[in-house]
């Protein structure tokens, strides 16, 4: 029992000496380096987020040789904040068209049961599909059809006035095990090549 007490006392004493030594070294190091380790000063938060953002832009762009005008970066500077407008359908479509990638092959890792084919399986497969815009493949036919739809001349039939991004070739087969350990093979599940049709 005496040994354990002596070992505990020695351990406490050593750890105290070690922590005092580490603190002293840290203080000496920070004193030697001086203002190099001073933390960066963060701008105080203001009530108006726009003013804070302007101050940040000014600080970033100050002294830059090819800096653009601050007003070009912040078109809302200098005018009072107005009510937010909801984007209309035309605006949403235009924004969607700008960000749309061209027609091409995409892939997604999904569980077989998520495909809705009637198989209960927890296995995952790499599902390749076609997606993207086909505006470059639009023909005169598509332009004419779009105009007739806009003028509501084609009311009853559902017609697409633009080419669609569709698979032109499929993977031969995809195989997986279901929840009952039965082996299944599905043909032409995943796309291999895409084109605007």
Swiss-Prot record:
Please state which protein family the record places this protein in: Belongs to the TGF-beta family. GDNF subfamily.
Any one cellular-component term (Gene Ontology): extracellular region
Q: Which organism is it from?
A: Homo sapiens
Specify the taxonomic lineage.
Answer: Eukaryota, Metazoa, Chordata, Craniata, Vertebrata
The GO biological-process annotations, alphabetized, read as: cell surface receptor protein tyrosine kinase signaling pathway; cell surface receptor signaling pathway via STAT; glial cell-derived neurotrophic factor receptor signaling pathway; MAPK cascade; nerve development; nervous system development; neural crest cell migration; neuron projection development
Spell out the protein name for this chain.
Neurturin
Q: Which residues form the signal peptide?
A: 1-19
Q: Which branch of life, at top level?
A: Eukaryota
Q: Where is this region: Disordered?
A: 74-93
Q: Where does it reside?
A: Secreted
Give the chief site where it resides: secreted
Residues binding heparan sulfate group are 149, 158, 160, 162
Q: Which disease is it linked to?
A: Genetic variations in NRTN may contribute to Hirschsprung disease, in association with mutations of RET gene, and possibly mutations in other loci. Hirschsprung disease is a disorder of neural crest development is characterized by the absence of intramural ganglion cells in the hindgut, often resulting in intestinal obstruction.
- Give start-end positions of Basic residues composition bias: 82-93
